[in-house]
A protein has these predicted regions:
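N-terminal non-catalytic cap/leader segment that marks the start of a structured domain
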Residues: 1-102
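Structural signature of FAD isoalloxazine-binding scaffolds in flavoprotein oxidoreductases
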Residues: 97-113
């Protein structure tokens, strides 16, 4: 299941994407909320969402993915762990040496743009 958090007509929701169509899981499954935080925290909720997405995908209901304005998957993450120099072309472009270990660094909520 591919998930997309975004807004349609100004209303933010979690959508399950299938091809060029998406179904609104926020409306279909109680407790999901308008980002992926609840799905990450509760595996049983994710299972419910997968089941509901399959059910809704069989029906004609849905919205075009092109009509969804993407948003952050988690609207207020406490900390973001980033991976720097994570692909060879990036390393070469920057003139860096390939590291023995990945470069990890953290960002706080305030650094999200």
């Amino acid at each position: 299941m591919r998930l997309l958090v975004g807004s349609v007509s100004g209303k933010r929701a979690v959508f399950a994407v299938d091809g060029d169509k998406a179904v609104n899981l926020t409306e279909a499954v109680t407790g999901i909320g308008d980002d992926q935080a609840a799905l990450i925290a509760d595996p049983s909720l994710l299972e419910q969402a997968q089941e509901k997405a399959r059910e809704l995908a069989r029906g004609a209901k849905g919205v075009a993915v092109s009509d969804i304005t993407p948003a952050l998957p988690v609207s207020a993450p406490p900390t973001i762990i980033c991976l720097g120099l994570n692909y060879t072309d990036h390393i070469k472009e920057g003139g860096y040496e390939i590291p023995d270990y990945p470069a990890l660094f953290m960002r706080g909520q305030q650094s999200i743009m």
